[in-house]
Amino acid sequence: MSSFLIVSILFFSALLSGIAVFFVKRDNTQLLKLVLSFSGAYLFAITVLHLIPEVYHSNQTPGEVIGLYILGGFLFQLVLEHFSQGIEHGHIHQSHEGHKHQAFPIAILISLCLHAFLEGFPLASGHRNELVFGIAIHHIPAAFALGSLLIGTRLNKQTIVLFIAVFAAMTPLGFITSKGISAGEIGNIAQYFDKIMAVVIGIFLHISTTILFESGSADHHTFNKKKMLAVLLGILVSMANFLFEGHDHSHHNHGPSEQTEETHNHDHHDHDHHDHEH
């Protein structure tokens, strides 16, 4: 997948979802909850199957240190959530909708943009195409919730769309920045890339588990068949990507191995032939 396509998918999925708040009833959240359940399960599975093994096998930083950075990312997201009020996992605060003019939620917007910026970092590390769709789907309810919150302020429609566009641009910006870091084009911080990735993994673990816990019924211990199907679908899609990539990887490795063995046999045959002539 080209960088242009990745940026387009990430930007327009969030932008269109945020703008949709002008046309869709905000009290109909059942579909959003199912989308959240799917994206939460997908993000969690991708993190466990791809991102965690990759950062531990980078061999640039000891595993114990990587674990500390993952915990740091988890705690960092806890702090961010205090300011964002959970909008990054689709919380729509309807209790404020009765007020015609709320104060502009600057802390929410900043923390949400920082969160979205960091989410773009794993996309530059290797083959992360499958993660693009997980993040894009995850941003649908987040952008919708942000749009709902901004509608309650004194801002006009054009300004609301502008702020939604700023949020939508954050993850593509994180992806481009991460790509520059991993290529060594931005400063001399490529050596810290695995630590940055570990922080993002901690954020993903917090976000995905929070989504899975909160996206069901009011009673979290009640079995919800639709939510369970959405969760299983998210895991199955990530597993399909994992198995497909694993097959390609093993097939790719098999080729050079056979080539090496063939070259070795050929050299051995030439050596015997030379001895026979001698």
Locate predicted features:
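Intrinsically disordered, metal-sensing/regulatory segments
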Residues: 1-278
